[in-house]
Amino acid sequence: MAVSNRRIDPTDLRRVHVLTAQRFPHEYLDEGLGAIGLFLHDPPKNAGYRSTPANSITFASTGFDGIHFGSLTDGDLIDPMSPVVITIPMAFEAPNYIVGQTLYDFLCLGCRHGYSNLGNLHLNFEATIEHYQSPPDDFYDERSRDILQTMTDELSLTSWPDVPGRFLDLQSRIIPMLRMPANS
C-alpha cells in the first residue's frame, strides 16, 4: 500500500491547534485539537506507562484513561516520518496499535471524525475500524466538523480509502518494532 511521504512536523500540528482554538472557541469545552481527541503534549516525552513502548515519544493524548499517541523513535525527539502508536493503558492484553506509518498518515486516519474513538480498539475492534471506514454524521461537540475541516485543509489530509486493510497491514509490519520497557 502506497503511503504519502508528506512531512508534517509537530510545529505544524501546534499551529493548527492555535488556529482552531482561535476560530472555534468554546466557553467550557476543550479548545483547538483537544475537541477532536488530540491534546498535544508540550514537551513531548515518553508517557511512562508500563504499556508505553520504550521506543516512543508521546506527543498527544485523547484526554481520557491515559490513552496516548506516540512517535516510534530511538531518540528523544518526534520523528514525523516514523510510525505512530496508540497506547491504551487499560487494555491489558493488547494495549498498543499502530495508527499510522507517519504522523501525516495518522492524521489522515482521523481527519473525518477525530481521534478519541481509537481508544475503543481493544473493546470492539471491528466496530472501531468500521467507525473510521464509514464515520457517523453526528459529533459530540458541534465544533468538531469545522475543526476537522480546518485541519484537513491546512495540512492537506486525505482519509484512508481502505481502513481495515491499511490498519491490518500496519499491525503486521510495525507492531514487531515496539520495544516494551523492562518493567512491563
Where are these regions (language model features)?
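Generic alpha-helical structural element
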Residues: 48, 92-95, 140
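Compact, glycine/acidic-enriched structural inserts
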Residues: 82-122
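Compositionally biased, intrinsically disordered low-complexity regions enriched in proline and serine
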Residues: 25, 29, 69-70, 98, ...
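An amphipathic alpha-helical core segment
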Residues: 114-155
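A surface-exposed partner-binding patch
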Residues: 1-81, 144-184
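Short alpha-helical interface elements
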Residues: 84, 128-131, 176
